[in-house]
């Protein structure tokens, strides 16, 4: 995680030396810019460490705290998700469309749990008990960024999770919008 984030920061500093950066591993690096790169170098760390294929690199660019560009790359799956605000979302160059389902009972949705679920009292388990009977199914992928990509592509009808940080969802939310 740390080496990957440092690489991103080094490259962004070369090309955009005045831009702010927010990274999962190193926090905020403020330079007083209206632009801020939001970086999650490895979303789905547990999946990666266990040899599971769902993990991503997620990067968003914000202008005055509004996300204007989002990029999520799932390297093992060779899926590149890209979006520019107002121009649609794409997977490997193919335009994406969110699901058109309007009934919760027909929906397959995803969720997640915080990495510290054993000590975090707000760990989402109680919500699943209430929601499961109302939906067609619930999935847990292990990467918030990838879950949002699946919503953007219409593979999932929705997604919720508690206690997320900006780097977890910055690019993915714009893909869905």
Locate the predicted segments by residue:
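N-terminal subdomain of lithium-sensitive/metallo-dependent phosphomonoesterases centered on the IMPase/IPPase/PAP
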Residues: 1-42
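Short, solvent-exposed loop/turn motifs
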Residues: 67, 95-97
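Residue-level signal for inorganic ion chemistry
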Residues: 1, 12, 45, 74, ...
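Generic detector of well-ordered alpha-helical packing
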Residues: 2, 25, 41-44, 48, ...
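DPxDG-like acidic metal-binding loop motif
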Residues: 31-90
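An extended, acidic
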Residues: 97-177
């Amino acid at each position: 995680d740390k080496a990957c984030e440092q690489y991103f920061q080094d490259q962004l500093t070369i090309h955009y030396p005045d831009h702010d950066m927010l990274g999962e591993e190193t926090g905020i690096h403020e330079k007083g810019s209206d632009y801020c790169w939001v970086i999650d170098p490895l979303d789905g760390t547990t999946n990666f460490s266990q040899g599971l294929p769902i993990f991503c690199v997620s990067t968003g660019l914000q202008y005055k705290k509004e996300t204007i560009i989002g990029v999520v790359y799932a390297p093992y799956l060779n899926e590149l998700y890209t979006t520019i605000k107002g121009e649609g979302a794409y997977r490997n160059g193919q335009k994406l469309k969110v699901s058109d389902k309007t009934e919760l009972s027909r929906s397959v949705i995803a969720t997640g749990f915080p990495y510290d679920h054993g000590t975090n009292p707000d760990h989402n388990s109680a919500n699943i008990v209430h929601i499961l009977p109302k939906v067609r199914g619930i999935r847990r992928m292990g990467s918030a960024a990838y879950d949002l990509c699946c919503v953007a592509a219409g593979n999932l009808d929705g997604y919720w999770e508690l206690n997320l940080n900006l780097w977890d969802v910055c690019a993915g939310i714009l893909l869905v919008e």
